[in-house]
């Protein structure tokens, strides 16, 4: 179970790192 959770966490982190920067920049521009 722990190994599976670690894999899921790694996948989620990688997805967030890949997807969030452009979205964060767009949201930051909209808020600003």
From Swiss-Prot:
It comes from the Bacteria. GO terms for biological process: amino acid biosynthetic process; branched-chain amino acid biosynthetic process. Coiled coil: none annotated. Pfam families: IlvGEDA_leader. Keywords: Amino-acid biosynthesis, Branched-chain amino acid biosynthesis, Leader peptide. This is ilv operon leader peptide.
